[in-house]
């Protein structure tokens, strides 16, 4: 009962934060599409609320490049990000990622050329790359594998939520066209980026490194959840292709690792990842 109450507190308080971060990441990644189009044409031949294409003198092809350049760094930095998070913990790393992409998103409103937009999008991909694997890692500190599926599906709803109202939000923000001499599309980036920065600052105080440092849990709940995490949940013979030796895994509940499983050196983990066929199957489905 105590353990269930503790997991319920995590579910009610931590998962909504994960959903919000994922929602903001998705909005900040995709709101450039809302900034593309011009407003209505005026009788004098000018355009009311010009879009980013007109403001930066970009062609549709150049704009498609701006959409694409985000993904190379987005894909490449996911693995390094999760190696970093193991060293410094989710409490610092996840809010830092959100703070970084929030700043980059805000600065996107200041770009004055297509080259500047390309560079901004590259750094946006770099900053957002670690969020999904980072949140997934954080959830593994609280839930056993059979419980993760629903929790992951829950925070992935952030993408669906963003699609339901991000367009309406961008349309409303673009009505600020002309205020302080800024175009409407610039205000979209300013407001949404600043809001992400504000949420990131709050997250420094509410995202834990694991059960041991989770403020919403009592000492007994923390110990029960940690004990539950490291109870056997599958047999070694169920995972022969991973070539994981049980003797290489140990449990050391210290203040540094928050009671996480200490696995073999990171390069062995990386090697096992690259030879796991499920990684490639999942990647194909995602593509």
Language model region names:
Residues 1-7, 11:
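Single conserved hydrophobic/aromatic residue that forms the stacking wall/gate
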Residues 8, 145-159, 174, 178-272:
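Central mid-sequence intracellular linker of multi-pass
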Residues 28, 57, 88-89, 110-115, ...:
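Helix-breaking motifs and short loop linkers at transmembrane-helix boundaries and internal kinks
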Residues 33-75:
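Extracellular/periplasmic helix-loop-helix junction of adjacent transmembrane segments
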Residues 51, 82-83, 172:
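Membrane-interface helix termini in secondary transporters
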Residues 71-79, 129, 164:
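Residue-level signature of mid-helix packing/kink "hotspots" within the transmembrane helices
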Residues 76-115:
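Conserved MFS/SLC helix-loop-helix module at the cytosolic interface between two early adjacent transmembrane helices
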Residues 104, 116-130, 138:
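Hydrophobic core of transmembrane alpha-helices in multi-pass small-molecule transporters
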């Amino acid at each position: 009962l105590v353990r269930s109450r503790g997991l319920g507190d995590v579910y009610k308080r931590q998962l909504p934060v994960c959903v919000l971060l994922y929602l903001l990441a998705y909005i900040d990644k995709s709101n450039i599409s809302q900034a593309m189009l011009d407003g209505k044409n005026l009788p004098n031949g000018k355009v009311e609320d010009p879009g980013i294409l007109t403001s930066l003198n970009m062609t549709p092809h150049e704009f498609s490049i701006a959409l694409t350049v985000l993904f190379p760094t987005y894909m490449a930095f996911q693995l390094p990000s999760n190696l970093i998070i193991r060293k410094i913990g989710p409490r610092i790393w996840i809010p830092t990622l959100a703070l970084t992409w929030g700043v980059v998103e805000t600065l996107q409103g200041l770009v004055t050329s297509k080259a500047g937009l390309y560079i901004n999008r590259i750094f946006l991909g770099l900053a957002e790359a670690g969020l999904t694997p980072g949140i997934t890692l954080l959830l593994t500190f609280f839930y056993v594998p059979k419980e993760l599926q629903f929790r992951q599906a829950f925070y992935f709803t952030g993408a669906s939520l963003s699609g339901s109202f991000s367009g309406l939000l961008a349309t409303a923000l673009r009505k600020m066209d002309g205020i302080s001499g800024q175009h409407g599309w610039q205000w979209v980036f300013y407001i949404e980026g600043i809001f992400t920065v504000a949420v990131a600052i709050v997250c420094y105080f509410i995202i834990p490194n694991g059960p041991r440092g989770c403020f919403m849990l009592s000492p007994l709940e923390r110990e029960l959840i940690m004990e539950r995490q490291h109870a056997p949940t599958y047999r070694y013979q169920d995972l022969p292709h991973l070539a994981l030796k049980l003797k290489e895994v140990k449990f050391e509940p210290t203040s540094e690792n928050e009671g996480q499983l200490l696995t073999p050196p990171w390069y062995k983990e990386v090697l096992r990842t690259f030879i796991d066929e499920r990684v490639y199957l999942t990647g194909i489905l995602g593509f």
